[in-house]
A protein has these predicted regions:
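Short, small-residue-enriched loops and turns at beta-alpha junctions
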Residues: 1-5, 30-37
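Alpha/beta catalytic cores of nucleotide-metabolism and tRNA/nucleoside-modifying enzymes
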Residues: 6-23, 35, 42, 46-57, ...
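Short beta-strands and strand-loop turn motifs
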Residues: 25-29
Length: 179
């Protein structure tokens, strides 16, 4: 729903099911929250109890343990990852590991992060040509949490070419090398 206390998700899910939907995805955050606050997983659980079709839960899944906890707490049939995958595609292997073995995987190294960021930029350049301005939004996520992230982000805002991004990712690697 739009705001807490005005919950329409279970009723809306029943209407979707009656109209022939084969599944519903539920983001447990009210529209009024935007990206603030915590997702309300109880809403997902209430939707799950109200329909016979699969329910896909979404909201506040940042690692494999979050995915397992959502499934345990809501009984949802599947989970959907949103912003947590930006700059962190490794989240999916962690989710798989936790769901299959109960164990989280180690975080990717700085070398792995920057190698993938560069590969992402290379693929975008092969698709878009010399100017890959759209890489800026993705690069911001890849450098999140690193030393000198503010300075790196400042440079990202003016990066245009693959060489620009390569230089930024190489600098991020030098600044954050694990000794």
């Amino acid at each position: 729903g739009f705001e807490e206390g005005n919950e329409i998700a279970p009723e809306f899910a029943r209407m979707a099911e009656a109209a022939g939907a084969s599944a519903v995805a539920v983001h447990g955050r009210y529209a009024q929250q935007f990206y603030r606050g915590r997702a309300d997983w109880d809403v997902i659980a209430r939707v799950k109890r109200s329909v016979d079709i699969p329910v896909i839960g979404n909201g506040d899944i940042a690692c494999g343990k979050d995915a397992q906890r959502m499934i345990d707490e809501t009984s949802c049939d599947a989970i959907m990852v949103g912003r947590a995958a930006e700059g962190n595609p490794w989240i999916f292997r962690d989710i798989r590991s936790v769901l299959e073995t109960g164990k989280s995987l180690p975080e990717p190294t700085i070398e792995e992060r920057m190698a993938l960021a560069l590969r992402h930029a290379e693929l975008l350049a092969s698709y878009e040509g010399k100017s890959i301005v759209r890489m800026r939004k993705h690069a911001m996520w890849y450098v999140g949490g690193l030393k000198e992230a503010s300075a790196l982000r400042r440079d990202i805002t003016t990066a245009v070419t693959l060489d620009d991004f390569r230089a930024i990712f190489e600098r991020a690697l030098r600044l954050n090398e694990e000794h």
